[in-house]
Curated annotation (Swiss-Prot):
Organismal lineage: Bacteria, Pseudomonadati, Pseudomonadota, Alphaproteobacteria, Rickettsiales
Domain of life: Bacteria
Biological process according to GO: proteolysis
Name assigned to this protein: Probable periplasmic serine endoprotease DegP-like
Keyword Repeat: yes
Compartments (UniProt record): Periplasm
Protein encoded by which gene: htrA
Gene Ontology cellular component list: outer membrane-bounded periplasmic space
Pfam families reported for this sequence: PDZ_2, Trypsin_2
Principal cellular location given in the protein's record: periplasm
Role summary: Might be efficient in the degradation of transiently denatured and unfolded proteins which accumulate in the periplasm following stress conditions.
Keyword Repeat tagged: yes
Active site residues of this protein: 134 (charge relay system), 164 (charge relay system), 242 (charge relay system)
Amino acid sequence: MVNLKIVIVIIVLISSNVVLAKENSRSLKVAAQEENEFTEINSAPLKVSEAARYSFADIVEPLIPAVVNISTIEYVNSKSENAEKDPLQEKVNDFLEKLNIPLNLEEVDQTPKSVPLGSGFIIEPNGLIVTNYHVIANVDKINIKLADNTELSAKLIGNDTKTDLALLKIDSEEPLPFVEFGDSNDARVGDWVIAIGNPFGNLGGTVTSGIISSKGRDIDIDTDNIVDNFIQTDAAINNGNSGGPMFNLDQKVIGVNTAIFSPLGTNIGIGFAIPSNTAKPIIERLKKDGKVSRGRLGVTIQDLTEDISEGLGLKNTRGVLVAKVQEDGPGDKAGIKTGDIIIEFADIPVKNTKKLRVIIADAPIDQEVKVKILRDKKELELPIKITSDNEEVTKDSTEETNKKEITNKEENNLSITKNNITFGNLTEELRQKYTIPQDKMGIVITNIDEEESSFKIGDLITNINQKSIDDISKLEELYENAKKSDKKNILLLIERGSSNMFVPLQVM
């Protein structure tokens, strides 16, 4: 009986093991199947070169020789406070002074000092170099140091302030290593990029890498700049990298490193480059003509803010406001007037002043385009023949400032005060004091009792709510009418130096 029980237990155990074995076998098959499926999903080949998986060395090695350091020479008087002290020269000077031999410090030889400016890159074996305009702006002498430490003088072939690009030329007996532009339109957010340059002026040939963080960035680095499609990267870019190249993994230049965003002045992972597709045509025009000609409308413009729109009785901020029309310019000849709102240019909707400047710059010179404006809340279409900006440059009214600082207050003049701002009638005394031409009419700001204001003493107000004004009583009337109508502000057209701009005055 005992033996029978043992046999039964053995059979049960064997059966259990068989079942477990089958389950384990099935589980293993499922796991294997799932593993195979998982492996297949993740075994798709990545579109990255084998070399770049582990190192960029093979990519950057042939590129570094084409990247240059740019510097200039300043002459420092050896006796100036900022000059480095030469102990031997000081001893000689002390000896001469003891002998009562006068020293003419102005005749002491000046010591040449190399001042780093930025980076650049060679685009042709004959020595053509691309860099940023701001790197070489206001510099008389430009020096180039190659990767092998050879130093050569460079001459400026041409520059374009509106895109911050410049073309230099060095002469060399031997063909120079060079790099080529690629297609920045093919670049995608997340692509690897490599920056090579001369950070802080003394670290030439520095290579950094990162990815494209974004494309089409519109940043306000300069009011004149019309580039509105910067490439953003987290590759380390610092002071001194300006003008250097941004490469893709195909060793092509897809950007010109131009700016960084940093409250500290050093890299925090936000850098910007001019796309190669923007730079290439500019460089070609600089090679050919040494300059870039663009379209000109001949008007001063400013953005429409909510306060300005409210002052004009508009319900939105579509378009840009014409603050001044240049006499005999294309806009003047076509009939554009101060106070008009440009809403379309060549069938392209106008969003803001920078967009309009870009559109005008790209407009065909000496050809007619259609411009749609809003005047007295009615749409009009005007044909305008665009001219070259080499004749005169169009600027945003907010770019210019009153160069003449006036701090004294005006007293004993018929005046009224609104919002801590004193307005006075334009007397002959005020004309002379604030240098206002005889043919100008309006009222003038004589005092401001607040620290921050969009107005300045000496501003001439010629228009309020698009109505001409020549007496402060009109200001009082329009201000009180707006107050009764529960309007937030009235709109003043001011003249400041050679510029015009609309500025809202809050109704309180």
